[in-house]
Amino acid sequence: MNFLAHLHLAHLADNSLSGNLLADFVRGNPATHYPPDVVEGIYMHRRIDVMTDNLPEAREAREWFRHETRRVAPITLDVMWDHFLSRHWTQISPDFPLQAFVGYAHAQVATILPDFPPRFVNLNDYLWSEKWLERYRDMDFIQNVLNGMANRRPRLDALRDSWYDLDAHYDALEERFWHFYPRMMAQAARKAL
C-alpha cells in the first residue's frame, strides 16, 4: 500500500493518519520519539505492509513482473494499489468523496508537521499541494511517480521499466485489488490490522 491506502485504512480503523503516513520515515522503535497515537499509527502501517506483501494476490502479482523488474515489484504494486483505490474511490467510499477525504487527511497530518523529520515535511509540501492522492487515478501520474522514485534512488532504477509490467497486467491487477482490498477495509473497521 502507498499513501492513499494507508490513510484510508487508518481512517477506517480510527487510527492516527499522521503515524500511518509518517511510518516510512521512521526506523527502529518510534516510542521514544513520538506520541503514543502516532506510534500506534506507525505500527499499524508496518503491519499493513507485512500483510500486503504476504497476500496471495500480491505474491501472485509479483510473479507477473519480468526478471529485470521483479526486485522492485513490491514497491510498484504498492503504488498501483493506490491507483485502483483512487480510481474506484466513489465505489469504495461513496459517502466520503475523495477530495473531501484528502482535505480531512491533510488537516489531520498538518497538525504534527512542524515537529517531524525534514524529509517527511518536504514530502507533505508536494503530496498535498500537487494533489498526488487524487492524481493516483491517472496512469500517466503513476508512471511519473515510479520515475521520480527511480530518480531519487538510483538502486531502484528498475522502477522505470516496471511500468510496462503494470500496463501488461492491468486488468488482472485490478481484479486482484478487488479480491483483497475490501477484506482489508473490513479488518480495519474491526480494528484488526
Curated annotation (Swiss-Prot):
It is an enzyme of class 3 (hydrolase). It comes from the Bacteria. Disulfide bonds: none annotated. Its EC number is 3.1.4.14. Keywords: Fatty acid biosynthesis, Fatty acid metabolism, Hydrolase, Lipid biosynthesis, Lipid metabolism. GO terms for biological process: fatty acid biosynthetic process. GO terms for molecular function: [acyl-carrier-protein] phosphodiesterase activity. InterPro entries: ACP_PD, ACP_phosphodiesterase_gpbac. Transmembrane segments: none annotated. It catalyses: holo-[ACP] + H2O = apo-[ACP] + (R)-4'-phosphopantetheine + H(+). Belongs to the AcpH family. Converts holo-ACP to apo-ACP by hydrolytic cleavage of the phosphopantetheine prosthetic group from ACP. This is Acyl carrier protein phosphodiesterase.
